[in-house]
Amino acid sequence: MALKHYKPITNGRRNMTSLDFAEITKTTPEKSLLQPLPKRAGRNNQGKLTVRHHGGGHKRQYRVIDFKRNKDGIPAKVDSIQYDPNRSANIALLVYADGEKRYIIAPKGLQVGQTIENGEEADIKTGNALPLANIPVGTTIHNIELKPGRGGQIARSAGASAQVLGKEGKYVLVRLRSGEVRMILSTCRATVGQVGNLQHELVNVGKAGRSRWKGIRPTVRGSVMNPNDHPHGGGEGRAPIGRPSPMSPWGKPTLGKKTRRGKKSSDKLIVRGRKRK
């Protein structure tokens, strides 16, 4: 999918880019795979704000995605590539030989009419899902499970991928995009290939209103708030934050502070940590 550039006929259009959606083959979603998606505006069930900068935006319906890829032995044909407003990647509608329809994340290079398979006997072909034990070393993969049968959790956004580095006993070594090398059970499933829509990260929003259409509200700097609203607030004019390191609105160290909880049971599965900036 290529980037579309606009003439600077208004200030909002200047430097603005968007995707040309050339890969999209169908605009109407499959009705049987839709669910209502009520707006929360960042509030929990008590009505309290728990996530900032959420609210407004266009009305959406949730597309039910098959992350488990557990329909083995029955081939499926790619019916269409569709846009999904709920994620950065595009989605592909599969029609199985028995008539069932399912959505999957569309990998790079997937074509309409292509046949897709799941299970241990599946070929090493883009879009096929099989256990890590059956995937050769060096293969690019995405939609990787962390626990067998739970469904893919890693490498699901646009352009994401990981690589199989080796096999040790019941574990498979996988290198993630962050540089982290992790051991994952060989019975966990993954999909062959890289997630499509690689140009997504290059899109220039261009104006604030376009973010509001997506349901993203403004992010106000702490330094322009009052001291009762943020640790960086207060002072006369453009005052410094007055602290040795930046703080979150709740007084916790941020911007570089590690947030992963210590002594997690999965720590022993991380062979090499992610790359430092």
Swiss-Prot record:
Q: Where is this region: Disordered?
A: 35-58, 213-277
Q: Does the keyword Membrane apply?
A: no
A GO molecular function annotation here is: transferase activity
According to its UniProt entry, the protein's GO biological process terms are: cytoplasmic translation
Q: List the disulfide bonds.
A: none
Known SMART domains for this protein? Answer: Ribosomal_L2 (SM01383), Ribosomal_L2_C (SM01382)
Q: Which Gene Ontology cellular-component terms appear in the entry?
A: large ribosomal subunit
Q: Which SUPFAM superfamilies match?
A: Nucleic acid-binding proteins, Translation proteins SH3-like domain
Query: Per UniProt, what is one Pfam family of this protein?
Result: Ribosomal_L2_C
Does this entry carry the keyword Ribonucleoprotein?
yes
The alphabetized UniProt keywords are:
Ribonucleoprotein, Ribosomal protein, RNA-binding, rRNA-binding
Record note on quaternary structure = Part of the 50S ribosomal subunit. Forms a bridge to the 30S subunit in the 70S ribosome.
By sequence similarity, the record places it as follows: Belongs to the universal ribosomal protein uL2 family.
Q: Briefly, what is this protein's role?
A: One of the primary rRNA binding proteins. Required for association of the 30S and 50S subunits to form the 70S ribosome, for tRNA binding and peptide bond formation. It has been suggested to have peptidyltransferase activity; this is somewhat controversial. Makes several contacts with the 16S rRNA in the 70S ribosome.
Please report the name of this protein according to its UniProt entry.
Answer: Large ribosomal subunit protein uL2
From which organism does this entry originate? Staphylococcus carnosus (strain TM300)
Q: Lineage of the source organism? A: Bacteria, Bacillati, Bacillota, Bacilli, Bacillales
